[in-house]
């Protein structure tokens, strides 16, 4: 190796770096941001140390710098050491040094998860179809394979295309000790890329809890979900960005989501009855007794398996031949699985039972509210809307047969002008109690659907 190459690779001394700085006519070093940048880029302690982490959107120190520290993120103590180092060059303006740090970090930005995923080489062995059975004892079938594939590809796309539309949550359902949470923690590769700290969605700091994480487990919220909270979770999952201000910024900025959400529960009825659909939640039952290995039996082997799992998913992602949704046929399978984990719908059962014995040929939501559900008060709009969902969903699914929504509003003896439902083949009796109403009259009134 030549002497010139050796000299180029030798660390620059403080004297060497001083020679690179701009000076006043009297030889004094100028206290400029550019000189600060030159020092940060060439001082042998600080060179290549300061980088902007595009996942956490924080500045990291990525190499040893000669003082005790824990973690990668630049902190106040690090700043004191850097200020002391800069004094060797006669520069002590904290404001200019901080500005230079931000510029240098931005010019040396990196994304740790992208770097990890791009470094993987797939060995050609398929694991996506088997991983949930291998570690958790899930059934090996097309549904389980597609559920895992969609989740993995969604996680990859969120990293390479932050803010992309992905509102699906993979939910693992099984007894305690099955390793569900551990699976998601290891799937995130590094512990700092995983979080299970998202307890509430109405917390002012909820969005900060997403920052720097790739896979976020929502076990507690899923375990205690009810009809209201599940709507909040669905709305939360559908978001593609958060807008907030970090401490060093003057104005709030859009933060595109780079994370995906996972659910774990041992409740067999964790999905509230949702007549508008639970398409965002993909439940997969697991059984630890059927697993080939427990994920922590040999953590090193498990992590190597997961590396290859991501490598396989990256091969699919790079091919571009994928969709982040089930096929129409598989969507039916998903709905069947969701039914297995839904809570009992008491109101729907009462409406169905009422219709079985009802002899009239027409019915409206207010009538069902009073006569099927036994209420005596006037229903709120959301209550009539819920009854409409019961009827319309029941008819579309075939749970309610022989009924259809009538096209125009009709006048009911006890309940006034209402839209409602009529028998497909009406009996000869009962029709005289109702009168047709014109579309114009109906439009002048308000109806729940």
Task: Give the positions of each predicted feature.
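A structural signal for short, well-ordered beta-strand segments
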Residues: 53, 68, 132, 261-263
